[in-house]
Curated annotation (Swiss-Prot):
Gene expressing this chain: queC
Catalyzed reaction equations: 7-carboxy-7-deazaguanine + NH4(+) + ATP = 7-cyano-7-deazaguanine + ADP + phosphate + H2O + H(+)
Summary of the function given for this chain in its UniProt record: Catalyzes the ATP-dependent conversion of 7-carboxy-7-deazaguanine (CDG) to 7-cyano-7-deazaguanine (preQ(0)).
Residue numbers binding Zn(2+): 187, 195, 198, 201
Originating organism: Chlorobium phaeovibrioides (strain DSM 265 / 1930) (Prosthecochloris vibrioformis (strain DSM 265))
Keywords attached to this entry: ATP-binding, Ligase, Metal-binding, Nucleotide-binding, Queuosine biosynthesis, Zinc
UniProt-annotated binding residues for ATP: 7-17
UniProt-recorded name of the protein: 7-cyano-7-deazaguanine synthase
Amino acid sequence: MKAVVLLSGGMDSLVTTAIAHNEGLQLAAMHVNYGQRTWQRELESFRSIAGHYGIGELLEVNADFLGTIGGSSLTDHTMAVSGADLQGTAIPTSYVPFRNACFLSMAVSWAEVIGAQKLYIGAVEEDSSGYPDCRKVFYDAFNKVIELGTKPETGIEILTPLIAMQKAGIVEKGMELDAPFHYSWSCYKSEGKACGVCDSCARRLRAFELVGVRDPIDYDVRPQYIH
């Protein structure tokens, strides 16, 4: 069976790819440039991870209209990328308005054309930045949209294997599957060394700390987030 994996190059999408690969599926991987600050580094990670898993069917999509729309510190250089707030409950400035719906729409189109029946995305609800399009209820609803908006015989289903996991559990799952964490990139701000202080870096570093393993990528600073 064929499956499309939405592969940003980050830790969550890496582990999701490892899970799908472990299922013995024929994988096709899609990466989206949406005008984000670190798109070149993320693309490098995408290609490295796809190569590691021998994924030959790749689609690199330009969706930089999301950058033109703006409204997010990931795409709008007039907005500062906020520092980590691991206890915060407000939706952070890094939220890209309705981004995942755009990604899923493009991925479903491709899946329908290439005959894929599964669509994997590394969304995390439990231990994440609180993005509204990373909730299980959102993906349940989108599966209904796919059912209503594609040919009856298509049968595409979105799978979110990490949705209820904590970040530390995601690291442990990746280690269990021997995922190449050194290829992944999570930083919102930097393409050289990861900054270590944005929300994404902080959640990643804390997860590795909780597991008791050193994160293999380079950081400009490497704060301790467990006190």
